[in-house]
């Protein structure tokens, strides 16, 4: 059923269809499902905000963490905070009411910030892949990845993300309620007159999904070959090789985490786009959409767990300058120092 700025393609045996901007959507699923959704969003907020905020605070507090590589990682934390503050707070409120009580404006805000965070994350991972490729594979001789390159990389992620998220606000496609009708996303569902949804979805999938993923897979494919060759030839010291491998492993795990979170959503969205008019249940889009939102917590958790130097700095910040686990963290800085001088980034 299509109405002004909404579309409900779900299997609906009740025969009742009401605007998700005006009425609770309890005819789609049991009200308990909305309560569970609200609880899930509350969990993402109470975990996602402090973890990402601490990532920013600790990096700004400790000068040794302000390295070019960490600029991109900080960018991921900022993107996650945008998702938490601008998107999750909106969704928890709407799920408590069972419909998008905030109207079209709230839908645009939630859809914009959720999509913005995802796009910044994907393009940041593409920039990280390029950085790792340049540092480890050295396709450009005597090139040193410095602060200016990192700033350019961060600027690129925002430019590309805004190029994907702003058009639906100004008429090229639109944000509409999806799934259980209490969160919003790009309109993959309709060919609504005047919005050119088809051209936007094709543009989005090609320019803002296929291209960055191709960059990521190309760079890491070349990088894995280079790491094996360097290890076989012993071209660098064992300490440097170990440090570079640790950074590369961390970023690859971030990429895998992104794919696990966002690939189901992208696949379902593409299926809906190519099967417009088909009917499906309300959970078909809800589950992958809200699973994708968990990406706001996995990046900082991966960074904290796999980065000894950052973990040490965070512990000393939390314990007022002392590290009660000093024995476990000992030697982290010395392991990373040589790689920092070799690659012009601090891998940890």
Swiss-Prot record:
It comes from the Eukaryota. PANTHER family: OPSIN. Disulfide bonds join 107-184. Glycans are attached at residues 12, 197. InterPro entries: GPCR_opsins (IPR050125), GPCR_Rhodpsn (IPR000276), GPCR_Rhodpsn_7TM (IPR017452), Opsin (IPR001760), Retinal_BS (IPR027430), Rhodopsin (IPR000732), Rhodopsin_N (IPR019477). Belongs to the G-protein coupled receptor 1 family. Opsin subfamily. The chain crosses the membrane at residues 34-58, 71-93, 108-130, 150-170, 200-221, 250-271, 284-305. Residues 332-348 have a biased composition (Low complexity). GO terms for molecular function: 11-cis retinal binding; G protein-coupled photoreceptor activity. It is found in: Membrane; Cell projection, Cilium, Photoreceptor outer segment. Phosphorylated on some or all of the serine and threonine residues present in the C-terminal region. Contains one covalently linked retinal chromophore. It comes from Sargocentron microstoma (Smallmouth squirrelfish). Keywords: Cell projection, Chromophore, Disulfide bond, G-protein coupled receptor, Glycoprotein, Lipoprotein, Membrane, Palmitate, Phosphoprotein, Photoreceptor protein, Receptor, Retinal protein, Sensory transduction, Transducer, Transmembrane, Transmembrane helix, Vision. The record marks 110 as: Plays an important role in the conformation switch to the active conformation. This is Rhodopsin.
